Amino acid sequence: MPKELNGWLDEVVKAAKKRKAVIKSRERNLYDIKDSIVKKKEKKLNPIIAEFKRRSPSGLKQDRDPLEYAKLMERFGAAALSILTEPLYFSGSYETFEAISRNVKLPLLFKDFVVTEAQVDTAYSIGADAVLLIVKILKDNELCFLYDYIKSYGMVPLVEVENEKDLNTADACGAEMIGINARDLNSLNVNVDRVAALLKIAPLKSIKVAESGIQDRSQILRLLESGADAFLIGTALMKDPQKIKLLI
């Protein structure tokens, strides 16, 4: 069983455990998100993981055509796409993810509150190349089990952390790709300074992704100096997709 949680996180996780798996033959090749990030860095570009989400608990309400957005991000040079599939608070769906997966050739991150094997099975079936795991909502043994389960499909786990304790937990599971979230999932407050501090002590061997709160190039440059390898950006790009050209 996942950790005991409160508020909206508890509601989301309880609902996630009840969602039915979508099991079908995968139609899409696997695209390596780590390789995509490395190639962008080799070209002296900022690797951007552009996120599609219609809504968020922090107040975002932005309805865009998902295919138009995904194709635009691909054309403008995103390293990967992150797609919210959580329905209650983010208005996400498996159908939107699968539609995007059929129309772009970028690595796709399955962004949800993953607590069951069924969700991982679904992610693979609908075309995911990477799957988010959130340390905050999983017990240590659950995290490591799901980490290995994701890898068994050939997908990449992105392990999300909020603090130094989370970092140590992620490292103990062998995390090769770590996301450092500026947003506290309880309060929803954003602190980009915390990301910069955690980047400096994150395992050198891992690919480090700065998540949440990134609005401009100056923030990216500061996070690069702290050790970030890639940047997951949602709200800023959902509001203005053209902004990616200023951030890459």
Which residue ranges define each predicted feature?
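Hydrophobic, well-structured mid-protein blocks that either form specific transmembrane helices
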Residues: 100-151
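Glycine-rich phosphate-binding active-site loops on the catalytic face of alpha/beta enzymes
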Residues: 83, 125-142, 179-188, 228-246
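Catalytic-face loop-and-helix region of soluble metabolic enzyme cores
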Residues: 177-226
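Glycine-enriched alpha-helix->loop->beta-strand junction motifs that scaffold or abut catalytic
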Residues: 77-78, 103-106, 125-131, 151-155, ...
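Alpha-helical elements of the RecA-like P-loop NTPase motor core of helicases
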Residues: 121, 168, 221
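Conserved N-terminal beta1-alpha1 strand-loop-helix module at the mouth
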Residues: 1-108, 115-117, 149, 155-176, ...
